[in-house]
Amino acid sequence: LSTETLDGLDWRPVTVARIPDHAASPQMCELNAKVSRHHPVSVHRAGDDSFIYDMGRNFVGQTDVVMPVVEDGKKIALYYEDYYLKDYADFRDGEYSDYYVGNGKSGGVFSSKFNYKGYRYLKIKGLEAPLALESITLSPVMTDFEGGADFECSDEDLNAIYNMSHETLASLVLGGYMVDCPQIERLGYGGDGNASTPVLQTLFNVSPLYMNWIQAWADCQRENGDMPHTAPNPYSAGGGPFWCAFMIAASWQTWLNYGDERLMERYYPNMCRWLDYAESKCVD
């Protein structure tokens, strides 16, 4: 910045913004935790300096890569994918990426500690030789709640469906609420919550998590009673009335599953405010 460059900008009059009142509440549920450790099961060359590592299945978590000595200033790219069609040709480089920059003196460890990833395939681009499988570790991350139910029968297809549902839901519950997807938006959509709550609350003891999630909905309720489609609500997201009504349906379901009526007692006024708002927008 300099006087010359600032004078050349197109300055406009100041706009006064009105900031609505918002509550700031603590996270009242278990923290995230790394629950296990996994290494890739195979590696394949995908170009002169690219290698794709297969984790064997999709995971959501922290990735740690032990890097060799890399030329000073050279950038090593890490790309993530949950699937590809064939021959690695449709691997979406740059869609979801991290970068490691070498110092030319010693190796280092890349860690996605502050940005978990959801993927099965990891492409590392910029190295002349593949890393040992043990150099790459994926540690699944989930909210550290307790299990609530198990299922097993003589039908292997039903067992597979149960295991898929169990692992999917566990992978989606991060940071005190359930996300729509762990690799893109990571938003707590009310529509997704309504569809998943009966199963999620049956498989796991997530009563504290729902106390936290419903609190987030109350925190971001607007002054006129309107509700967003996601909570927490960092930016606008799509949905409809079914999304906004999550506070009502989830509180009721929490009482049915756990006998815990605190959500209905605590947030009944918020529910009434939203219903009044919704009714004000209805015609006939």
Over which residues does each language-model region extend?
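Carboxylate/His-rich catalytic cores and anion/metal-binding grooves
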Residues: 73-82, 148, 190-215, 268-280
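A glycine-rich, coil/turn loop motif that links secondary-structure elements
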Residues: 182-188, 237-240
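Helix-terminus loop motifs that line ligand-binding clefts
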Residues: 86-95, 207-284
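Extracellular/oxidizing-compartment recognition motifs
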Residues: 1-182, 191, 208-209, 228-233, ...
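Generic anion/oxyanion-binding catalytic loop in active/binding sites
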Residues: 111, 154, 185, 199, ...
